[in-house]
């Protein structure tokens, strides 16, 4: 059975969870990854109730060691990977703490870099032609008032994804 890894999974009605369910319905064992174990367990249980396979992985996408460990836990056979992480919270630039802006960038873009690096290494090691997808937002294409941190982080992630596509 092929394996898929989806990172950035929150509530059952969110995009990450719905991607997991759709992928599982296409004969993948899905590794459901995110920050909140309770949310992950709900998604995993829903997938299992549908007669499919899934496991949860709690992860901090900005921690390189966590990301490396996550790909080890998935093991061989990874064929499909999705980075669906983002923190879309409004805030005016002049009112925004630097720590908030940095967290937004680290979560959306830096975490995407760490994830892609480990997934690509896995694909190359196994000599597979796996698929790596980054979910985006219209925020990656244009700035929007009160969303400067999210806009800039998603724009950077889009550029990273384009660079990766040209390299591999």
Predicted regions and their residues:
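Rossmann-fold cofactor-recognition segment
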Residues: 47-64
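Rossmann-fold scaffold of SDR-type NAD(P)-dependent oxidoreductases
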Residues: 7, 78-86, 108, 134
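Active-site loop of short-chain dehydrogenase/reductase
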Residues: 2, 77-78, 123-136
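Catalytic loop of short-chain dehydrogenase/reductase
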Residues: 8-10, 131-156, 161-162, 166
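Canonical Rossmann dinucleotide-binding motif of NAD(H)/NADP(H)-dependent dehydrogenases/reductases
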Residues: 1-30
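Catalytic Tyr-X3-Lys loop
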Residues: 87, 94-113, 133, 157
């Amino acid at each position: 059975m092929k394996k898929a890894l989806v990172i950035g999974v929150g509530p059952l009605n969110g995009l990450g969870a719905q991607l997991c369910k759709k992928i599982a319905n296409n004969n993948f064992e899905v590794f459901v990854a995110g920050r909140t174990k309770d949310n992950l367990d709900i998604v995993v249980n829903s997938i299992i109730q549908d007669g499919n396979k899934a496991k949860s992985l709690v992860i901090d996408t900005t921690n390189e060691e966590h990301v490396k460990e996550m790909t080890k836990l998935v093991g061989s056979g990874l064929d499909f990977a999705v980075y669906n992480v983002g923190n879309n919270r409004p805030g005016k630039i002049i009112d925004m703490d630097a720590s908030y802006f940095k967290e937004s960038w680290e979560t959306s873009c830096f975490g995407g870099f760490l994830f892609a690096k480990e997934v690509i290494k896995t694909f190359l090691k196994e000599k597979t032609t796996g698929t790596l997808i980054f979910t985006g937002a219209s925020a990656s294409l244009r700035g929007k008032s009160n969303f400067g941190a999210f806009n800039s982080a998603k724009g950077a992630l889009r550029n990273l994804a384009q660079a990766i596509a040209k390299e591999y």
